[in-house]
Amino acid sequence: MSTGVLQFVKGIDFSGNDFSGDRFPHDVEQMTQMTWLKLNDSKLEQVPDELSRCANLEHLQMAHNQLISVHGELSDLPRLRSVIVRDNNLKTAGIPTDIFRMKDLTIIDLSRNQLREVPTNLEYAKGSIVLNLSYNNIETIPNSVCANLIDLLFLDLSNNKLDMLPPQIRRLSMLQSLKLSNNPLNHFQLKQLPSMTSLSVLHMSNTNRTLDNIPPTLDDMHNLRDVDFSENNLPIVPEALFKLRNLRKLNLSGNKIEKLNMTEGEWENLETLNMSHNQLTVLPDCVVKLTRLTKLYAANNQLTFEGIPSGIGKLIQLTVLHLSYNKLELVPEGISRCVKLQKLKLDHNRLITLPEGIHLLPDLKVLDLHENENLVMPPKPNDARKKLAFYNIDFSLEHQRKIAGQMTSPSSSISSVHSGGARQDALARRKEFIRRRKQQADQQSADKVIQGMSKIAGVGAALTEKQQEEEERQLEAKSAVNWKKNIEKNRRHIDYSDIFDEDVGSDEGMWVWEIENFYPSIMDEAFHGQFYDADAYLVLKTTREASGQLRHAIFYWLGEHASLDKGMCSAVHAVGLRNHLNATCRTQREEMNDETEEFLTLFGEEIVYIEGGRTISGFYTTEKPAHLTRLYRAGVNGTAVEMEPVPLSVESLDPRFCFLLDAGETIWIWSGYKSRITVSNKARLFAERLNKRDRKGKSEIETCRQARCPPEFWQALTGNPDKPQGAIVEHVPEGFVAERKKLYKVNIGMGFLELPQVELPKGIAKQDMLGSKGVFVLDSNSDIFLWIGKKANRLLKMAGQKLVVELHQMIDRPDYAQVYRETEGEESMMFRSKFAGWDEIVPVDYTRTSDSVQRVPDLKVIVKKDNMMRADLAALFLERQPSMSYEESEELMEDCNYDLELMESFVLEGKKFVKLPQKEFGIFYTMDCYVFLCRYAVMPEEDEEGEDEHDEDDKPEMDFKCVVYFWQGRDASNMGWLNFTFQLQPNFEEIFKDKLEVVRMYQQQENHKFLSHFKRKFLIKRGRRGLTKNLGGKWPELFQMRANGSSVCNRTIQVDCQANQLCSAFCHMLRIPFKEIEEDGHRGVVYVWMGKDSDPREHEFARQVASDLVVRDDDNDFRIVEVQEGEENEEFWKVLGGKKKYETDSSFVKHTRLFRCTNEKGYFAISEKTVDFCQDDLDDDDIMILDNGDAVFLWIGARSSDIEAKLSYQAAQVYHASMRMKANEKPRKFMLAVRGRESCRFRKCFHAWSKMKEPMG
């Protein structure tokens, strides 16, 4: 359906569409008045034939396509002014020669093609002002080109293979921009340059320039503003450049300049100076005189602190400063006075610190300081403390120490911060004093003005009061008048002659009107008494009294189904009829089925009701269109949810994706069995917002998985409740990218329309691109939206409605593509999802507790509870938990075993628990589960009066209690626990009743009482007990004995049989079975390796563990050999894969600490794990901070939230700064530990580190 609007289109931007093959819209030939057309990045393979009918076309862009020829159609465009076909596959033969003879042709862009020579007849384009032939393979420029194109203003020949330029180039006296970069130009002396007096841009980067082929003087080139002589290996700055007074931009990077010999008064107007990649050691002091300089690049030189002018702070206009890859150890304090600085790069230097004022630069956005190993950042001033607030939490070290209740000493480094802050506070007080004085002066001036106005107002009020008293006296003197006469005199007479005839009510009779389109329409007498229930009527009955006067009765009748406008108009016109007749009667309301007797007598008590309505309403009636069921494929791009429309069929489903089926009353979320749960959850949230915004909450939201789809889903999708027979297969291509969105803006002028595109940076549309006074079209190929602003005029709206219809029809689209109309402020959820950040997200403070979220009338009440801004970081400032001494450990072990009467052990074999042999007591396997039944004596309670009053026979008997310890290996499944709860536990409960206690423990997380029963003989082997006993023992095994915090926690755990697993702080056992029995009958050997820093008191226990536990029950013929660190034999290292580097620094054992960061309590809190922590204490739901004495690691769990990660990062920095103060002699690095890729420095803090567990699901 044609709207007839195409003939008025003056220009349109079709860039970004897919016009490959025969997809170019044929309706373009109807745009006969079109003067400009953009077809950039449209996959064109040839010039469309339709362009030959656009005879008025003046500007044509076909860049970034696949054109190999532009013959034919371009020759049929006589008014062509600009041809832009850059970045194609054009060769010289593919360019028609006759287009250059067009007298109006002014812009020619053939850059980024495959031209080997200048196109034929180019010299005939004498009216050209722009010529771009860059990025081709052109080797020569004909003399005729420069001789004839004397009107050129812009000439770009860069990135070709030119070795020479014709001497006629001097004729281009009007040339303003000349770009020749990246050409050999070995034989071009640049002698013609001084004749180009209009030249303002000269780019000759990488053109083999030397001091000999650059003119010695450029005095006549007063307009030269942009010069690029980079990548030319120049030893010094050419002398001619210093005389360019109007120079704005100078690029001399990539040369061999050692010194910048500029003097004061030169380059006064310079704004950009690039001296990167040279050999500069000093920047001259006169650089600070370049007061207009905004960008200074001096990276990759040899600058030191002395080489930077101390007065650099005078460059107040400086926004960009690059000093990377130099030899800077310090930077001048003046840099902090460059108040407009936005980007500062100081990476790859030798910086030690920075000026304190660097934090006060208001506009600084980029500060690059990486690869400065010894850099110590200055503390931020107290004035900026509010900027440290992070999620309503102040993470400054001083504030957190104050909260933790620790006061800093005067000698600490914090005191220096205070002193600096005092200076800042003094300055702030001066500023505040000046501000108050100014405010006070303004207030005094305002008081004087108000006082003067009050006086004037007082005088005026007195005069007004006297005038009112005088008027009241005059009114009292006048006689009272009839109020009815005043009303009659002031009544506004309205002419009703256009509505009612003159003879209406002038004699006896009855008149009936029906309301039609807001006005009464007189009815024939034949229809009196017939009333439609959807209409309203006006009735006038006039009778003559005996005195001869006329008496009127006016009624208005409302049908049961009459529309609002008919009822209102009947009442209004009844009053108008009374005024028209100058009647004194009242208007009476009559309703269907409730008429008065007086009204019924008018029609002889015979009224006929007819269903329906005979007249039309004055309102426009619209019928809500039927809902169209649509299917969308959900995708996630960052935090945004993208809904891609797909055909409504089973074939569109893919098991790797989630889909949203919008069936109107029900919104279905379908998830394939390979889809991600996060995508499904976000699709569900999108459906919730869609239902709330577009459906007012009337739709139901249902979710279903691929394996279980209810019949209702198939009914909505296919119209049949039965599940389709065919399988759902993967069909969406890998790496599928939806077609790029295009945003058009509708422009209207005197008799023409334009449809340009709004530039979308990186293809991202934002809400602020829409304007209330405009009309926009968002085209996503499968859907097209017309957005109308509130302040758009009527003609613009009409033009947008017609253009969106034409745009929908002329471009090839899927059959399911739809057109939607959006109004500003009432946009649909689907339209909003096309724009980044356009969503109704309520900001939430995740650090608040449930109490603070309650609705409290006064916000101060919440703040007093200290919940809104609460963060518990006190654990970071506590001292490390001291290790238990050997004597204390012995005493604790004795106390824990004092009340033990009996201990029975069981192990899970198959699905049953069997009694564990006594010789295996203390041996555990990581894939098994064990049960230990312990009977403890309970001491009787003593009376307060003492025991003397009791006889020996009356002494209370000893009681007991039973504790069942369930031990689960790290690699064991939960089936063991289920078998225990259904088999053993019921039996134990039946026997011991209320004296039973069940304690479940995991590997390396046992309590002290349980460990005390094994008296340091606690061995954990890898694998399963039954399988290892039958098939194991035939290969070398390495065990590490380690006690964390207390010797009670002594465990011997099997580790990888490699040399790098050794540690000088602990004892190790290496079990080596021999392939053949030795002559002395030994079948193997167990080496007990004593680390040089291990506790000598642990050596005896290491020998016992080796002989009792490491040597298997059938390995009594293994000999035990003690080895001191450094005295190993060749056999020892050979079994471990050769001698390798292992951990010899044992100091980390005394400093290791592990902190847990979480907000599970409703606020952010940090707690410290016990010294006896293990690998499984790294919780995937939280963030951990590990300190090993040399580095502070931040470990991020796989399921932790972004909020926890950000807060933990700030807290780790607080801890790092705190430890720098406490232990300045042992500085720590701040590092990140990636889950699953932890470094050896991180892993050494955990006993027997192994592969990380993967979370279920």
From Swiss-Prot:
Gene Ontology, cellular component aspect: actin cytoskeleton; cytoplasm; nucleus
GO molecular function, one term: actin filament binding
Function (record text): May play a key role in embryonic cellularization by interacting with both the cytoskeleton and other cellular components.
Gene3D superfamilies (alphabetical): Ribonuclease Inhibitor, Severin
UniProt keyword Repeat present: yes
CDD domains referenced in this protein's UniProt entry, alphabetically: gelsolin_like, gelsolin_S1_like, gelsolin_S3_like, gelsolin_S5_like
Ranges for the LRR repeats: 6-31, 32-54, 56-77, 78-102, 103-126, 128-148, 149-172, 174-195, 197-221, 222-244, 246-267, 268-290, 292-315, 316-338, 339-361, 363-384
Protein name: Protein flightless-1 homolog
Matching InterPro entries: ADF-H/Gelsolin-like_dom_sf (IPR029006), Gelsolin-like_dom (IPR007123), Leu-rich_rpt (IPR001611), Leu-rich_rpt_4 (IPR025875), Leu-rich_rpt_typical-subtyp (IPR003591), LRR_dom_sf (IPR032675), Villin/Gelsolin (IPR007122)
GO biological process: actin filament severing; actin polymerization or depolymerization; barbed-end actin filament capping; myofibril assembly
UniProt record similarity statement: Belongs to the villin/gelsolin family.
Gelsolin-like repeats by residue range: 523-600, 640-714, 759-832, 1168-1243
Pfam families, alphabetized: Gelsolin, LRR_4, LRR_8
Keywords: Developmental protein, Leucine-rich repeat, Repeat
SUPFAM superfamilies, per database record: Actin depolymerizing proteins, L domain-like
